[in-house]
Structure formats: structure tokens, C-alpha cells
Design a protein with these regions (language model features):
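Short, surface-exposed, charged/polar-biased interaction segments
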Residues: 22, 30-34, 43, 110, ...
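Context-gated lysine
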Residues: 10, 14-15, 68, 79-81, ...
Length: 167
């Protein structure tokens, strides 16, 4: 687990809400406090969609919606002349990307033993922190998956020109 302090909150928010920077992440949950508190559960309810629409939900069939699907809703909740009092977003890496990370990093973990790789975003009204996390279905003292996930996130931040400092 690694904590990253975002150096340019305004630029980060633009990338989060107005671009596709985070669109491939799955949304586990999100909450924002503005004039009221709003909570979004990222659980996918595929029975809501017609059979034709459901066929196009391949990535989301793992049970969570893609950020790109709820980003406009989250933007609507946050836009206005006042900054949100706070927000928290919990992203999770899509299962096919978890498998790619394992393969590319040469790890011995089995994908079915990994419940999720997470990126938690926390804004407190002035500071924005990103915290990596993992959840395994098995006990292990091996932290190689955490290190690989942190390395992947650091490369992601660099590629997307998101300036962070580590704690």
C-alpha cells in the first residue's frame, strides 16, 4: 500500500471528470459531499439492460461499472462555483488488467486468489490523496503483488502527467 499526494488538484480533477484518463477503471464506490452527501455504489445490475445492451458489457460483467459510465453523473454532482467539501472514490482494476499485471510482472499469484487491486481517491476540501490497496482471497506474506501494483500506478501517473509525491 502506497500513499500519493496529488500536487496539482485542479489538473487532476480535470483529468478525472472531463477526460478518459480513468475510464478503464471499475468503480467500486464513490461518495461526494456538496450541498448534500451523495453515495454511488458501483455494483453492476446487468438485468437493468436489454439483452442487446447486456452483450456490450463484457468488461463490466465482473460485477462493477466502468468509471466512464458514471463519470458524467459524478461531474453533475460536483460542478458549480463551489468546490466539494469532500469526496472519496474507490477504483478497482479490471480483472483482465490484473491478469496482465501478474503476467508482465512475472508474479506467481493466481488471478482467482486476488479479490481486487484498488486505487482510493480522497479529497478533504484542499488535499487530494491517492492510496493503492489490494485484497487477496488467500493469506500470504508475499508483498510482490502490492509492489507491482504500486509500480504500475506510478507509471500510470507519469504517463498521464499526474504529478504526485509519495508519503
Amino acid at each position: 500500500m502506497q500513499s500519493y499526494q496529488v500536487q496539482d488538484v485542479k489538473d487532476f480533477m480535470k483529468k478525472l471528470l472531463l477526460t478518459d484518463t480513468f475510464d478503464t477503471f471499475l468503480l467500486s464506490e464513490a461518495s461526494v459531499t456538496t450541498y448534500a452527501a451523495f453515495h454511488l455504489d458501483g455494483s453492476m445490475h446487468s438485468d437493468y439492460f436489454s439483452s442487446d445492451e447486456a452483450e456490450s458489457l463484457t468488461v463490466e460483467q465482473c460485477g462493477y461499472v466502468l468509471w466512464k459510465r458514471v463519470r458524467p453523473i459524478f461531474f453533475e454532482l460536483m460542478k458549480g462555483k463551489n468546490t466539494p467539501l469532500s469526496f472519496q472514490i474507490v477504483f478497482r482494476l479490471a480483472p483482465h488488467n490484473v491478469e496482465s499485471l501478474i503476467r508482465q510482472s512475472g508474479l506467481s499469484h493466481r488471478p482467482e486468489d486476488i479479490d481486487g487491486l484498488f486505487l482510493n481517491l480522497r479529497y478533504d476540501g484542499s488535499n487530494l490523496t491517492c492510496i493503492s490497496g489490494s485484497s487477496l482471497r488467500v493469506f500470504t506474506m508475499d508483498r510482490s503483488l502490492d509492489h507491482a501494483w504500486d509500480t504500475m500506478l506510478e507509471k500510470f501517473f507519469h504517463k498521464k502527467e499526474i504529478i504526485v509525491s509519495t508519503h
